[in-house]
Swiss-Prot record:
Primary location group: secreted
Additional remarks: More than 20 analogs have been synthesized to study the effect on cationicity, hydrophobicity, alpha-helicity, amphipathicity, antibacterial, antifungal and hemolytic activities. A decrease of hemolytic activity is accompanied by undesirable decrease of antimicrobial potency.
One BP annotation, GO: defense response to bacterium
Organism expressing this protein natively: Halictus sexcinctus (Six-banded furrow bee)
Protein family according to the UniProt entry: Belongs to the lasioglossin-like family.
Role noted for this protein: Short linear cationic amphipathic alpha-helical antimicrobial peptide (AMP) with potent activity against both Gram-positive and Gram-negative bacteria, and moderate activity against the yeast C.albicans. Has been tested on B.subtilis (MIC=0.8 uM), S.aureus (MIC=7.7 uM), E.coli (MIC=3.8 uM), P.aeruginosa (MIC=45 uM), and the yeast C.albicans (MIC=6.2 uM). Has also noticeable hemolytic activity (LC(50)=102 uM on human erythrocytes, and 82 uM on rat cells), indicating it cannot be considered for therapeutic application.
Name of the molecule in the record: Halictine-1
Keyword DNA damage: no
Gene Ontology CC annotations of this record: extracellular region; membrane; other organism cell membrane
Modified residues (Arginine amide): R12
Subcellular compartments: Secreted; Target cell membrane
Keywords of the record: Amidation, Antibiotic, Antimicrobial, Fungicide, Immunity, Innate immunity, Membrane, Secreted, Target cell membrane, Target membrane
Tissues and organs where the protein is expressed, per its UniProt entry: Expressed by the venom gland.
Amino acid sequence: GMWSKILGHLIR
């Protein structure tokens, strides 16, 4: 989902 992109950016 979109959370994957958001979290992926924050938890890079």
